[in-house]
Amino acid sequence: MPEHLNARVEACYRQAEHFFQRSFPRPTVSFRLRGQKAGVAHLDENLLRFNPQLYRENREHFLEQTVAHEVAHLIAHQLFGPRIRPHGEEWQLIMRGIYGLPPDRCHTYAVKRRATTRYLYRCHCPEHNDFPFSPQRHTLVAKGRRYYCRRCKATLVFTGEVLRE
């Protein structure tokens, strides 16, 4: 997987170097990005992070558009400095003029939502209201934190039910 992506990063840099007649330091490339973002450029660290799941599901467009998009951020930063807008004129110039690509801000890849886990807690109100807790909040309860019902002021108690959505 990384070979094609690294080759595309290198190709984008060579195009920029040919156009601007100067060399640019190569970034570190990481595949440790999750969630909805396809890629992120860390300007001061000269680092590119890519989402491996979105790459696998959208390989052709990802290599063409997303890699160029993120490389353009680093090139624009190195050419014009830190005070430019992320998707401003300078970045758009690189996307259109060098890579011949539309300067799209966001991808349109289908992103699968991660399964969520909720732990049901209940109070002693007559209605027996359920309170779904996140795993983080459930862990805090296990460590001694208490949460209270706003109506009856009783401590919320874990019912033993776990919901997976």
From Swiss-Prot:
Pfam families: SprT-like, Zn_ribbon_SprT. Keywords: Cytoplasm, Metal-binding, Zinc. This is Protein SprT. Its cofactor is Zn(2+). The keyword Methyltransferase does not apply. Transmembrane segments: none annotated. It comes from the Bacteria. NCBIfam families: PRK04860.1. Binds 1 zinc ion. The active site is at E70. Residues 10-158 form the SprT-like domain. Zn(2+) binds at H69, H73. GO terms for cellular component: cytoplasm.
